[in-house]
């Protein structure tokens, strides 16, 4: 199923919810390019956004569940002036047929970079990142000023190759 078809189905569900709940008439549904979250509700802008990557990587039922989660935020805001995952949101998400959970179980895009701490002849993975921070050479581990200059980015592919023994540490490109 293409991203366009999936978004069309999500838009249809949103239109249905707008017909059922008149307070949603002035709201818009859009796509964005978030990589670390599935959807977001902007109450003051009256806009709900679903991630293009979420649509690309997940089933329609998972995407619709995300829409329901965000519409529950919109209804809780419009009818109760509540933001966040409070009691009104929980009631709305349940009433709409969703699960009252703050985070869902869904696929996210692979990251391009791994943030590592170089320790003598080893690399310790600290985090995965979609983008590199240009000031990495100034970073330290919390409470560890001795780690200045020891934090690097490594491409995800090279890190996996090093982990599996396909690359020696001396062959890994460490980027600061």
Q: Where is each model-derived feature located?
A:
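Metalloprotease/metallohydrolase-associated module, dominated by Zn2+-dependent proteases
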Residues: 2-61, 78-176
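Active-site recognition of the HExxH zinc-binding catalytic motif
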Residues: 65-77
């Amino acid at each position: 199923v293409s991203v366009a078809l999936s978004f069309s189905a999500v838009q249809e569900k949103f239109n249905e919810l707008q017909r059922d709940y008149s307070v949603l008439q002035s709201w818009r549904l859009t796509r964005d390019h978030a990589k670390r979250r599935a959807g977001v509700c902007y109450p003051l802008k009256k806009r709900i956004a679903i991630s293009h990557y979420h649509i690309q990587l997940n089933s329609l039922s998972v995407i619709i569940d995300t829409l329901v989660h965000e519409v529950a935020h919109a209804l809780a805001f419009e009818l109760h002036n509540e933001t966040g995952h409070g009691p009104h949101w929980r009631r709305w998400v349940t009433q709409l047929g969703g699960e009252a959970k703050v985070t869902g179980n869904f696929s996210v895009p692979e990251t391009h970079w791994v943030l590592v701490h170089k320790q003598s002849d080893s690399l310790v993975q600290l985090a995965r990142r979609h983008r590199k921070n240009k000031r990495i050479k100034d970073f330290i581990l919390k409470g560890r000023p001795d780690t200045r200059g020891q934090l690097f980015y490594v491409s995800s592919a090279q890190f996996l190759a090093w982990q599996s023994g396909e690359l020696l540490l001396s062959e890994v490109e460490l980027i600061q």
